[in-house]
């Protein structure tokens, strides 16, 4: 009986196992659907699927639970908020330093990325040595770190004195520095029509609807050139020709010359407005020489006759050579009575001794 019972039990168990097999067969298409989509996955055993009906959902929530875990790791744990402290030191080049808390006197690491409100005039984020700041304390990898660093009551930090400053006029630097106040409409009405440089403002504003700078530049450029160098450009733009003004020194020199040399009165000087102009040197009129005396005129005639008719006068255009030695004067010296003897004539006193010598012989 036991064998029969076993056989029966075995017979009964076989149909039950066969019945269990078709019952386990329907869950097979569910795991095969990913394989049909193209992912090469092996079918899971039926015993696992049948024995743990909740096992289908177990692998699904696993990645969902891992995402919050990663976000929690990214967010650091906040230890304290709105803590006041004094900057112990901060290196601008390396971008980190330490802040000493005022409550616990503990040094907290601070990085330049933790500065929330930087000085707008500074290029790099930084905090100055000895500056009082407000920050949050979070737990970092190696200890306490500062986050959301600002000035007291949330104002921007002062920054380190070693951090580079921004340029004050980056856009339109040259135009804003020497430009007038921004009253473009008034300037266009006042100076647009009477511009001395011939500039005409645009007629229709619709043509430049989107270009704001193109409307600004033509309107206030002409006043710049007039206001930049007012004393120089006013004299140059209206009248660039040289004017003639009477010079006081020349007037005095003219009066003196009229008294002495006969220069006409009212001598004028040509004055230029250009301050760098230097007038050229001009030789004045030749001075009239006084007429020579009668005796001097006769002497000149005698000298010309002695030198010869072809030779030019010795006084005008004569220049002694470099290696010239003075020769003794010819025997045409002036006599005591004031008359000259020519070089060809022999003196009257010399022949007398000659006749005496011949008679003695």
UniProtKB/Swiss-Prot annotation:
Keywords: Acetylation, Cytoplasm, DNA-binding, Methylation, Nucleus, Phosphoprotein, Repressor, Transcription, Transcription regulation. It comes from Rattus norvegicus (Rat). GO terms for molecular function: DNA binding; mRNA 3'-UTR binding; nucleic acid binding; ribonucleoprotein complex binding; RNA binding; RNA polymerase II transcription regulatory region sequence-specific DNA binding; single-stranded DNA binding; small GTPase binding. It comes from the Eukaryota. Disulfide bonds: none annotated. GO terms for cellular component: bicellular tight junction; cytoplasm; gap junction; nucleus; perinuclear region of cytoplasm; synapse. Abundant in the skeletal muscle, spleen and fetal liver. This is Y-box-binding protein 3.
């Amino acid at each position: 009986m036991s064998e029969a019972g076993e056989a029966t039990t075995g017979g009964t168990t076989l149909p039950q196992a066969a019945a269990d097999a078709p019952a386990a067969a329907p869950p097979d298409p569910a795991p095969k659907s990913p394989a049909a989509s193209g992912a090469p996955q092996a079918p899971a055993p039926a015993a696992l699927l049948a024995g743990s009906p909740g096992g289908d959902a177990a692998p699904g929530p696993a990645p969902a639970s891992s995402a919050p875990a990663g976000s929690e790791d990214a967010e650091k744990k906040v230890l304290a908020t709105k803590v006041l402290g004094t900057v112990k030191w901060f290196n601008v080049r390396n971008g980190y330093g330490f802040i000493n808390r005022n409550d616990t006197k503990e040094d907290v690491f601070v990085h330049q990325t933790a500065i929330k409100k930087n000085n707008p005039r500074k290029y790099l984020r930084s905090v100055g040595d000895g500056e009082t700041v407000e920050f949050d304390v979070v737990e970092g990898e190696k200890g306490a770190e500062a986050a959301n660093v600002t000035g007291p009551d949330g104002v921007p930090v002062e920054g380190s004195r070693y951090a580079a400053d921004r340029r004050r006029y980056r856009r339109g630097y040259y135009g804003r520095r020497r430009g007038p106040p921004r009253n473009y409409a008034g300037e266009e009405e006042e100076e647009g029509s009477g511009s001395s440089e011939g500039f005409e403002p645009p007629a229709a504003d619709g043509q430049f609807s989107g270009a704001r700078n193109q409307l600004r530049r033509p309107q206030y450029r002409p006043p710049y050139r007039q206001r930049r160098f007012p004393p120089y450009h006013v004299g140059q733009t209206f009248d660039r020709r040289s004017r003639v003004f009477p010079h006081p020194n020349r007037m005095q020199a003219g009066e003196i010359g009229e008294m002495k040399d006969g220069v006409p009165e009212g001598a004028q000087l040509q004055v230029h407005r250009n301050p760098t102009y230097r007038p050229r040197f001009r030789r004045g009129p030749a001075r009239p020489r006084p007429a020579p005396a009668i005796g001097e005129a006769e002497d000149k005639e005698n000298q010309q006759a002695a030198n010869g008719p072809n030779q030019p006068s010795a006084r005008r255009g004569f220049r002694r050579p470099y290696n010239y030695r003075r020769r003794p004067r010819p025997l045409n010296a002036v006599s005591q009575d004031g008359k000259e003897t020519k070089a060809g004539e022999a003196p009257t006193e010399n022949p007398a001794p000659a006749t005496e010598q011949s008679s003695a012989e």
